[in-house]
Swiss-Prot record:
Its EC number is 3.5.4.16. One of its GO terms (biological process) is tetrahydrofolate biosynthetic process. InterPro entries: GTP_cyclohydrolase_FolE2, GTP_cyclohydrolase_FolE2/MptA. One of its GO terms (molecular function) is GTP cyclohydrolase I activity. This is GTP cyclohydrolase FolE2. Pathway: Cofactor biosynthesis; 7,8-dihydroneopterin triphosphate biosynthesis; 7,8-dihydroneopterin triphosphate from GTP: step 1/1. The record marks 153 as: May be catalytically important. PANTHER family: GTP CYCLOHYDROLASE MPTA (PTHR36445:SF1). Pfam families: GCHY-1. It catalyses: GTP + H2O = 7,8-dihydroneopterin 3'-triphosphate + formate + H(+). Keywords: Hydrolase. Belongs to the GTP cyclohydrolase IV family. Converts GTP to 7,8-dihydroneopterin triphosphate.
Amino acid sequence: MQEPKNSQTLHDVANGASDLEGPLAWVGMEDIALPFRLANSAVNGRASAGVSLDATSARGIHMSRLYLALEALEHEEVTLSGLGAVLQRFLASHDGLARTAFLDLSGDVLIKRPALISPRAGWKAYPCALRCRQDTQGMQAVLEVTIGYSSTCPCSAALARQSIQQAFDEDFTDMPISHEAVRTWLGSEQGILATPHSQRSQAHLSLRLADDLETLPVTALIDTVEDALGTALQTAVKRVDEQAFALANGQNLMFCEDAARRVRHALQARDEVQGFRVRIVHAESLHAHDAVAHAEWNWTPNSP
């Protein structure tokens, strides 16, 4: 398509002066469609791009320059150096107007996960976001990841065991006890008279990354947290996998406080992480509300 011929220079009102003066902390665009790659996964992503408007008399910024700078990320594996180059381009294209640049990327990372025992496997989606900022102090990057897992209430498990003990006492009082009789009883519905309540839970991670990383260790960090919790959500399973999952839940009884401490200790051991904020959410099946715990380490509220 040919551009319309026009011998006159098109006027850009953004270059004009504002009637009301004053700096603006952030000006830009949100929810921009942008395909990129993260953790070797193609992501149908979204981007937010902006800069501060520090020239108090300037009417506005050049949003098209931010939009065009994002082309460098299309279909490419996201790296901190690549994000830094885009942020520098944001600032270079707004020389004299802006001192701080911002870039957020978000989308689901797909990772294929094997079953616990059988050869089956399936895909899991991990919502991820990268929130980056470039200013006179340098570049800061925060990786956000949401990880789903299962949690079984320790209190409920203890009450369930007590109920089973009481039922055992009632059924075997004044009776000779044989190994076969007990084994049969344990395999009956009476032997599992009560079950502890469990819930699908989430760990929301905000991780301040070391600025010298060549690659983003998204999968490794997810693996670290899932290993610490011990009850990662499954994909395709057979009965043998479901049995193994039940065993994992029984061996990893967790209040939200327990889960938060497990994740905290696991992340503190990762050199790639310089600080973090963790939000643990157990969507209670007993109550209509959620049980929540937060953990922080070397975290500042003004992280991007």
